[in-house]
């Protein structure tokens, strides 16, 4: 066995067309295309959800850091006011 040559592939293709018919193959192609389109859409939506969740996590971490910094500066300001008294 040498492998698949172009003539063998053509013979197999012709047999498939004769076996299933062009209308069945056209329907199969349309179904396959719709499935691929749905898969790509789902992957794109999954990426958008992951990005938004990652962004929210990053924003909450930044908010927490800002709140901690403000609390620390407020406590330092209160301590300096107590020292002045």
Curated annotation (Swiss-Prot):
In the UniProt record, does the keyword Protein transport occur?
Answer: yes
Q: Does the keyword Protein transport apply?
A: yes
Q: List membrane-spanning regions.
A: 1-21
Q: Which InterPro entries match?
A: TatA/B/E (IPR003369), TatA/E (IPR006312), TatE (IPR024905)
Its GO biological process annotations read: protein transport by the Tat complex
Molecular function GO labels = protein transmembrane transporter activity
> Out of the domains of life, which is the source?
Bacteria
Q: How does it sit in the membrane?
A: Single-pass membrane protein
Q: Which GO terms describe its cellular component?
A: TAT protein transport complex
Cysteines paired by S-S bonds: none
Q: Cite the residue spans of the region called Disordered.
A: 64-85
Write out the annotated subcellular location: Cell inner membrane
Q: Which UniProt keywords apply?
A: Cell inner membrane, Cell membrane, Membrane, Protein transport, Translocation, Transmembrane, Transmembrane helix, Transport
Major localization listed first in the record, in broad terms: membrane
List, alphabetically, the Pfam families matched.
TatA_B_E (PF02416)
Q: Which family does the similarity line name?
A: Belongs to the TatA/E family. TatE subfamily.
* Annotated function: Part of the twin-arginine translocation (Tat) system that transports large folded proteins containing a characteristic twin-arginine motif in their signal peptide across membranes. TatE shares overlapping functions with TatA.
> Mind telling me which HAMAP family this protein's record contains?
TatA_E, TatE
Matching entries from NCBIfam families are given as: PRK01614.1 (NF002448), tatAE (TIGR01411)
What is the protein name for this chain? Probable Sec-independent protein translocase protein TatE
Q: Which organism is it from?
A: Yersinia pestis
Q: What is the lineage of its organism?
A: Bacteria, Pseudomonadati, Pseudomonadota, Gammaproteobacteria, Enterobacterales
This chain is encoded by the gene named tatE
């Amino acid at each position: 066995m040498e492998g698949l040559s172009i003539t063998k592939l053509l013979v197999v293709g012709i047999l498939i067309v004769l076996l299933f018919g062009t209308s069945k193959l056209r329907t199969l192609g349309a179904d396959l295309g719709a499935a691929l389109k749905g898969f790509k859409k789902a992957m794109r939506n999954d990426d958008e959800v992951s990005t938004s969740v990652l962004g929210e996590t990053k924003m909450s971490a930044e908010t927490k850091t800002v709140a901690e910094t403000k609390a620390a500066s407020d406590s330092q300001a209160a301590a300096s006011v107590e020292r002045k008294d």
